[in-house]
């Protein structure tokens, strides 16, 4: 059996392994093995060059699959910190009111006196409330 067929078979097996053990980026390795196997079948005399090409393609494919792994993902209210919203009501004496940000309405708390229509910056999160401050010059 030619070595190219072995690489193609290995590529399919590695891709199938993703169905058994998901989340380990096996498809990237499988695609690289498939590409390398096809190249070996088409031009076997250039095995070394095709290995280098397959290695580069593997790095590119893995980068696409793995990009973003390890980055901190902000979920819930934390994703709004640093963004600007608009007050949709006058804030009460206790400092609570509602703001609109990204077409969502959130409960907010502030030490500033905030009126309906004022722009506010989200500076933090406390429980389910956003902590805001009035944007200067508004």
Curated annotation (Swiss-Prot):
UniProt KW keywords: Cell membrane, Membrane, Transmembrane, Transmembrane helix
Location(s) in or outside the cell: Cell membrane
InterPro entries found in the cross-reference section: Membrane_assoc_protease, NA-bd_OB-fold, NfeD-like_C
Origin: domain of life: Archaea
Claim: Membrane is one of the keywords in the record: yes
Main subcellular location of this protein, as a coarse class: membrane
This protein's record includes keyword ATP-binding: no
Transmembrane feature ranges: 1-21, 46-66
Pfam family, one: NfeD
Membrane topology label: Multi-pass membrane protein
GO annotation, cellular component aspect: plasma membrane
Protein name: Uncharacterized protein MJ0826
Organism: Methanocaldococcus jannaschii (strain ATCC 43067 / DSM 2661 / JAL-1 / JCM 10045 / NBRC 100440)
């Amino acid at each position: 059996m030619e070595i190219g067929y072995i690489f193609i078979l290995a590529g399919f097996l590695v891709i199938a392994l993703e169905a058994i053990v998901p989340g380990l980026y096996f498809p990237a390795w499988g695609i690289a093995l498939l590409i390398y196997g096809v190249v070996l079948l088409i031009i076997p005399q250039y095995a070394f060059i095709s290995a280098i090409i397959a290695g580069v393609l593997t790095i590119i494919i893995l980068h696409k699959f793995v990009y973003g792994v390890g980055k901190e993902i902000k979920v819930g209210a934390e994703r709004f910190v640093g963004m600007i919203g608009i007050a949709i009501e006058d804030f009460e004496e206790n400092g609570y009111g509602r703001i609109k940000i990204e077409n969502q309405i959130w409960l907010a708390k502030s030490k500033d006196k905030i009126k309906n229509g004022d722009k506010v910056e989200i500076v933090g999160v406390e429980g389910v409330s956003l902590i805001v401050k009035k944007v200067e010059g508004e």
